[in-house]
Amino acid sequence: MAVQQKIRIKLKSYDHSLVDKWAVKIIDVVKQTDAIIFGPIPLPTKSHVYTVNRSPHVDKKSREQFSFSSHKRLIEIMNPTGKTIDMLMKLELPSGVDVEIKS
C-alpha cells in the first residue's frame, strides 16, 4: 500500500470574510491540478477579551472591554503534484491572512 502525501493549509485572520474568500481561491487553484481536496473545514473561533481601566489613576470601577475574534480554516490536499505546489507558491495572499503550511 502506497503512502499518501498530504499538505495541510491553515488560514487564520481576524476577518471571517477574508478567510473564506481566500480559502475558496486556494481551492480553485488546487482543483486545476487534479489534486484531492478536503475543506475548507472551519476550526473553532477564539475570542479574546481585554479589560482596561478608563481612567489612568482613579475610578477602578470604571472599566472598558475590548474584544476580537480569530477565525481559522483548514484545507487538506491529498496527493499534491509539483504543479500544485508551484501554483500555491505563486498565490499572493493579503497581509490580513496568516498562512501555515504543513506536509
From Swiss-Prot:
InterPro entries linked to this entry: Ribosomal_uS10 (IPR001848), Ribosomal_uS10_CS (IPR018268), Ribosomal_uS10_dom (IPR027486), Ribosomal_uS10_dom_sf (IPR036838)
Highest taxon in the source lineage: Bacteria
GO MF, one example: tRNA binding
Pfam families (UniProt xref): Ribosomal_S10
Annotated keywords: Ribonucleoprotein, Ribosomal protein
Ranges in a coiled coil: none
The protein's role, per its UniProt record: Involved in the binding of tRNA to the ribosomes.
Annotated family: Belongs to the universal ribosomal protein uS10 family.
Name listed for the protein in its UniProt record: Small ribosomal subunit protein uS10
Lineage of the species this protein comes from: Bacteria, Pseudomonadati, Chlorobiota, Chlorobiia, Chlorobiales
